[in-house]
Amino acid sequence: MRKTVSRIGEWGFRLLKHDFTTVDLFGRWGGEMLGEMAADGWHFADRTKTAAEIITDLYRVIYDAAKPSGMLILGCNTIGHLGAGLMHMNRTGDDTSGLMWERTLRFGVNTLAFRMPQHGAFFDTDADCMGIPGGIDWQYNRQWGRLLSLSGTSMFVSVKPGSLPQDQEKELGEMLRANALRRAPAEPLDWQENGLPQDWKLDGKAEAFHWYEPGGLRVGCAGGPIWERVWREVSSALDAKDI
């Protein structure tokens, strides 16, 4: 791992995103770790170290190997508190979407609001991309982009060059320029009543966002088959009064 990361830095890359390390280590996604992180009886080869120590050692090897080249580290599918100080940025939520607006709200807006306390303390937080163009109306996606651009956190955009109309491309450019300026972290104001905060303080000024479509939020299982199974298991347990 150390040699691989060092080589990538020597090639001239300035940002390395390492992903899927938690599922690689334990064989399960976070949503599958209901009570147990791995299959019954499974363990690391070195039983003299705890799982936390082994994970932290991995993050440290990646971080230290990137230092000589000055390469920045973005962790994804990582365990946040163990990565504090060992990654420059951390993707703090699940994937947002350029197709499913609900997914962007659940894993973008919610993540930005409720993982914000980690920003600047553990690492710079990244609530995932503004995904365009896709099936999401620009009037909604532009709001997500504006919030990210003024949030004080990292902003990433997934877009095919030349695919946007001129006015949208200009607006996107303004968002990216705004995000490049250092600013105070955004503060959700209605977070105690709303899991998808609509009222925010940006640069000291209150601003309201309107996330919901006229017909309401189109709710589905945005996490796919894994979360569908998790939901069935939790629902069955609740029905059986096991928890």
Task: Identify the function of each model-found stretch.
Residues 1-134, 168:
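Aromatic- and carboxylate-enriched substrate-binding clefts and catalytic-loop regions
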Residues 20, 75-77, 134, 159-161, ...:
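Active-site proximal loops enriched in glycine and acidic residues that flank catalytic Cys/His/Asp
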Residues 22-23, 79-81, 155, 162, ...:
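Short, solvent-exposed loop/turn segments at secondary-structure junctions
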Residues 127, 159-165, 187-192:
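Short coil/turn segments at secondary-structure boundaries
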Residues 133-149:
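Structural motif
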Residues 138, 142, 169-183, 187-190, ...:
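Loop/helix patches that line or flank the sugar-binding groove of alpha-linked glycan CAZymes
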Residues 147-183:
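Catalytic cores of secreted or luminal carbohydrate-active enzymes
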Residues 148-152, 156, 190-243:
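Carbohydrate-binding surface patches
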